[in-house]
UniProtKB/Swiss-Prot annotation:
Subcellular localization: Cytoplasm
Keyword Cell cycle: yes
Annotated ranges, domain PPIase FKBP-type: 166-245
Molecular function GO labels: peptidyl-prolyl cis-trans isomerase activity; protein folding chaperone; ribosome binding
Protein name: Trigger factor
Family that this chain belongs to: Belongs to the FKBP-type PPIase family. Tig subfamily.
Keyword tags: Cell cycle, Cell division, Chaperone, Cytoplasm, Isomerase, Rotamase
Region of interest called Disordered, as start-end residue ranges on this chain: 442-471
Cellular component annotations (GO), alphabetically ordered: cytoplasm
Known catalytic reactions: [protein]-peptidylproline (omega=180) = [protein]-peptidylproline (omega=0)
SUPFAM superfamilies the record matches: FKBP-like, Triger factor/SurA peptide-binding domain-like, Trigger factor ribosome-binding domain
Domain notes: Consists of 3 domains; the N-terminus binds the ribosome, the middle domain has PPIase activity, while the C-terminus has intrinsic chaperone activity on its own.
Matches recorded under NCBIfam families: tig
């Protein structure tokens, strides 16, 4: 098989492929088997008759057409591997020449146009300089941390007064469209100001006393009338306030491992400091990424962006939002999509240059942390990723994070007061030693066999996921 590439643009190529007759033969043989299972010839068992009878029944041309249709994707994938292309989109195929069905020689020729990952030229990214806010904590930060902890142990007490922001209320609601009842619910619990129910609800209930009602106009967000304008009547049936426990030694013993409130406060100072340090690290990471994007020109394949936009604005994804597809929203989503594309291309290029790989321990550590964020069992989360074919995507994500951490480690980061910022915790993420030991034990890695060190198992999934061609 021969293949040649013509660059149409930095993100699009034309691939010319020639498949000699001898390489068509396996597909032709498979085509005969496929057709033999689909036709019936008197006097022969299904699938058990000579090829010449199939030629007589359906025609040699149909056999050749079937062979080409079944083999085309494989030849395309072979050409992609042979030329080192990294496709991003579905290929557009044009068959330009087929062998004469009556002949025993000839070539199959076809052309493919497809969007590919652009090549980028990396600058010297060592020593990128960025400035971030100081990791300082205030008295308000420390008090908020304590109050948040007290809130977790608070109790709700009835309040004999009108509802106010942050109160916990119980309500009944009824929705009407054109004076017709379309939905209702009773005994709903809600925190005033949360903004998690209907738009306009917070304003309607503030100031209401028990057994009072208010009427407001809004758009429904669920059910068969989602997105439709409705008139909603809300009745307040109870008001409660959260009563916080006293911040004393008893509370410290209840809410923590400490015996005194002084020890708890000291630990909260450490937690707030850690939180501020993380915020500072995130700011540095984001600014380093912004600098990379400024320094590196990344061509963007328009068709890939358009496909993602269409997926985002598919009516099935509107979730009842009438204003889901607006010009303003499209501009915002396009900008975010293009930014994400640039980030991926740049970080993949850095990972390639630095020969960054992903260890099994790093992959599972990422899965465990992600599962925790979703409140899922890590094993179930990993199984879900595997069944949905998302493991390569996760590997790529971890690899890009490591690439960005590498660049961040080479950067010069100072705060706005001129002090150097230590980002060692961000650029050298440590895998839990117990987790790594367990993984190695499960894999049979001991480091003692034949007096040689066992190398850490590495995930060898490709960072590319062009998908199979569909014609």
């Amino acid at each position: 098989m021969k293949s040649a590439v013509e660059n149409l643009s930095p993100t699009r190529v034309k691939l010319d492929v020639e498949v000699p007759f001898e390489e068509l033969q396996p597909s032709i043989a498979e085509a005969y088997k496929t057709i033999a299972e689909q036709v019936q010839i008197p006097g022969f068992r299904k699938g058990k008759f000579p090829n010449r009878l199939i030629d007589q029944r359906v025609g040699r041309g149909y056999v050749l057409e079937t062979a080409i249709n079944e083999g085309l994707n494989g030849w395309y994938q072979n050409a992609v591997a042979e030329t080192g292309l990294r496709p991003l989109s579905r290929p557009e195929v044009e068959i330009t020449e087929v062998p004469d069905p009556a002949a025993t020689d000839g070539e199959l020729k076809f052309k493919v146009e497809v969007d590919v990952r652009p090549e980028v030229e990396l600058p010297d990214y060592a020593g990128i300089t960025v400035e971030v806010a100081p990791a300082e904590q205030s008295d308000e930060d420390r008090q908020k941390a304590l109050d948040d902890l007290r809130g977790r142990f608070g109790t709700l007490k009835p309040a004999d007064r009108p509802a106010a922001k942050d109160d916990f209320i119980t309500i009944d609601i009824n929705a009407k469209i054109a004076d017709e009842d379309v939905d209702s619910a009773t005994g709903l619990s809600y925190q005033v100001g949360a903004g998690t129910m209907l738009e306009g609800l917070d304003e309607a209930v503030e100031g209401l006393s028990t057994d009072e009602e208010a009427i407001f106009d809004t758009k429904l967000v669920g059910g068969e009338h989602a997105g439709e304008a409705a008139q909603v009547t809300v009745k307040l049936t109870a008001v409660k306030v959260r009563e916080l426990p006293e911040a004393d030694d008893d509370f410290a013993q209840l809410a923590s491992e400490f015996d005194t409130i002084a020890e708890l406060r000291e630990d909260l100072v450490k937690q707030v400091n850690q939180s501020k340090t993380v915020e500072q690290g995130v700011e540095a990471r984001d600014k380093v990424m912004e600098k990379l994007v400024e320094l590196i020109e990344v061509p963007i394949p328009e068709s890939v962006i358009e496909e993602q936009l269409e997926q985002h604005f598919d009516p099935a994804n509107a979730h009842g939002e009438e204003d889901h597809d607006t010009e303003e929203h499209r501009v915002e989503v396009r900008e975010n999509t293009e930014r994400a594309f640039k980030n991926e291309i740049i970080l993949d290029a850095v990972a390639d240059k630095e020969e960054i790989s992903v260890s099994q321990a790093e992959l599972i550590d990422y899965i465990v942390n992600s599962a925790s964020q979703y409140g899922m069992d890590p094993n179930q989360f990993a199984q879900m990723l595997d069944q949905s074919g998302q493991v390569p995507m996760v590997v790529s994500e971890v690899r890009r994070r490591k690439a960005l951490a590498h660049v961040l480690g080479l950067a010069t980061v100072t705060d706005t007061e001129g002090a150097a910022v230590d980002l060692s915790d961000f650029v050298k993420p440590a895998v839990d030693p117990e987790l790594e030991a367990a993984l190695n034990e499960a894999a049979g890695v001991t480091g003692e066999d034949d007096d040689t060190e066992a190398e850490e198992e590495r995930v060898t999934v490709s960072a590319d996921d062009p998908g199979a061609a569909r014609f």
